[in-house]
C-alpha cells in the first residue's frame, strides 16, 4: 500500500509541475483560450487513454505503474478546477462566446483524445 501511495504522490507531483510549466509557457499565447491548460487536459486525456489500453493488454505489469501514470501523473497534469476558473473569468469579462468555445474544446477534445489513444494503442497491441 505504501508503494502505491508513493506512486500516486510522485506521479501527481510530476504531473502538476508539467501542467504549471505548460501554463506558464503557452497561456500567454492567446488572450481568451488558455492554451497551456487546454494542452495539459488534451495531453492528459491522450495519456490516460493510452495507459488504459496498455494496462488492459499487459496484465502482468505491476499495478504501481498504472496508478503512477493514470491516477498520479494524469491526475496532476489535467485540471478541472483551473479550467473551470478560466471559464468563469471569461464569463465575468462578458466573453460568452469564448467561454463556450473553451468549454467545448476542452470537453470534446478530451473525450476525442482519450478515445483516439485507446483505439490506437489497443489496435497496436493486438498486432
UniProtKB/Swiss-Prot annotation:
It catalyses: fluoride(in) = fluoride(out). The keyword Cell inner membrane applies. Keywords: Cell inner membrane, Cell membrane, Ion channel, Ion transport, Membrane, Metal-binding, Sodium, Transmembrane, Transmembrane helix, Transport. GO terms for biological process: cellular detoxification of fluoride; fluoride transmembrane transport. Fluoride-specific ion channel. Important for reducing fluoride concentration in the cell, thus reducing its toxicity. One of its GO terms (cellular component) is plasma membrane. The chain crosses the membrane at residues 4-24, 35-55, 71-91, 103-123. It is found in: Cell inner membrane. GO terms for molecular function: fluoride channel activity; fluoride transmembrane transporter activity; metal ion binding. Its main location: membrane. Coiled coil: none annotated. It comes from the Bacteria. NCBIfam families: crcB, PRK14196.1. It comes from Salmonella typhimurium (strain LT2 / SGSC1412 / ATCC 700720). Na(+) is not transported, but it plays an essential structural role and its presence is essential for fluoride channel function. This is Fluoride-specific ion channel FluC. It is a multi-pass membrane protein.
